[in-house]
Amino acid sequence: MTNEGTRIPGYVSLDKVGNGAPYVLRAGEGEHIAVRSSLRTLLTRQEDTEGHMGLTYCEGDTAPPTPPHYHHDTTEGVYVLSGVLRVWQDDRKGNRIVSDLHPGDFGLLPTGWAHSWAFAAPKTRFIAFYAPGGFEGTLHYLDPHGAPTAEQLGETEKRFDVVWMPDYPLIQESEKTG
């Protein structure tokens, strides 16, 4: 099953403008994909950057966290534009961090660290990058209406650098450090 994207004003298929050629997306343009109660917009993909990176714009209201996961080779970064983004990180060796990121804050989610994030306030917007690119492709495989199914998570594990940990305990509010 693939999430083919929500055709809303500003939808631009990156297959028509990207693939290694330079391009410009105007405000509100990109490949829009509905995921639960949020909208993700692909701005650039692995195939547009010779594999070097992917970049998405994300916006949504308060929502449950993404399934915890980690990457063998991919580093993620998030830059908050508005609202609050709650980020959980765990190096799986005893170092656990949870941070509320506010406008202007940046968070790095390193390779190998288990992590998750959630829209923690209404009208939260942020930019996410992935290096090397590829993980952004998971958005096409997630259910636009609810939490991802085990089948959807398994399919993305086969195609992308991600190991999902749906039963991994997130840090409780009382453990918050940043």
Residue ranges and their predicted role:
Residues 67-68, 87-89, 99, 109, ...:
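Short beta-strand His + acidic residue motifs that chelate non-heme Fe in jelly-roll/DSBH
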Residues 42, 55-59, 77, 98-100, ...:
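Conserved hydrophobic/aromatic beta-strand scaffold that supports enzyme active sites
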Residues 48-51, 60-64, 84-86, 93, ...:
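Short, charged/polar surface micro-motifs in flexible loops or helix N-caps
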Residues 68, 72-103:
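A short beta-strand-loop-beta hairpin characteristic of the jelly-roll/cupin
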Residues 1-45:
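Long, hydrophobic/aromatic N-terminal blocks
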Residues 120-178:
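Double-stranded beta-helix
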Residues 27-68, 74:
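A short glycine-rich, His/Asp/Glu-containing loop-to-beta-strand
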Residues 26, 48, 91-111:
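Short acidic-glycine-tyrosine-enriched beta hairpin
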